[in-house]
Amino acid sequence: MRAFLGRPVVHLLLAGAAALLSHNALAHLEDYGYPGADVANGKKIFNEGKGDAVPACMTCHGAGGWGLDAMGAPRLAGIGYPYVLKQLGDLADGKRVPVGAGAVMPVFAAALTEQERHDVAAYVNTLKGPPELSNLQELKDGGTAIGERYEGLAIVKYGVIGKVSACQSCHGYNGRGAAPMFPVIGQQKYTYLVAQLTAWRDESRANDPYGMMRKMAHNLTDADINNVATFLASASTTTAGNTVVPETNQ
């Protein structure tokens, strides 16, 4: 078994990752808060597409950007402008090659100009509507393996000694994000969380700075992945008695 990634190692990884920000996204930190992005154009592309080259993003990701479990399409709404921008750039450049329904994304991303990717990323980060959470019971009834929420909570909050660090040490409380490096993963779609954690573990996805997510997911079992996804898919964004959500995901 690999050695546990203790706090000093995690901090070293974070420091190194901060220097590796993608040229397509995090190198544009002068655009943080998205000055220069045309949010109205991003909305148009999201809702209507771009001619015959790019269908409306909402077709798969939903009108509110909350994703669709049935298609394995992730939530994009409010998960972080720099992160979405980086993913679109990586998809366009061939640095991220999804499988399944997401396999069409590199073609669509490449059909967008860099400016249009900025526009779309900015628009989806303005989507702050009521959560449209995964229906875990419906997924279970349909034959999808669902984990144990309390076991997922333990991994997210505390990690497992000798296996994985706490998810919230990077992604913030209940996965509510820590911009600009770490996206919102709380209230993400269940099927997408399972697919991505599996891809990180199997190293079929490899566009993470310094291989951080691959290191974190390496020792996770299928049960661990299902448990984490079960908790995160319905995780509260606020602490008990506090309804204020910090601006952690711009």
Feature map (PLM): residue ranges:
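Sequence context surrounding c-type heme c attachment/ligation sites in exported
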Residues: 43, 47-58, 85, 157-168, ...
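Axial heme c-ligation environment in periplasmic c-type cytochrome domains
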Residues: 69-77, 91-127, 132-140, 178-184, ...
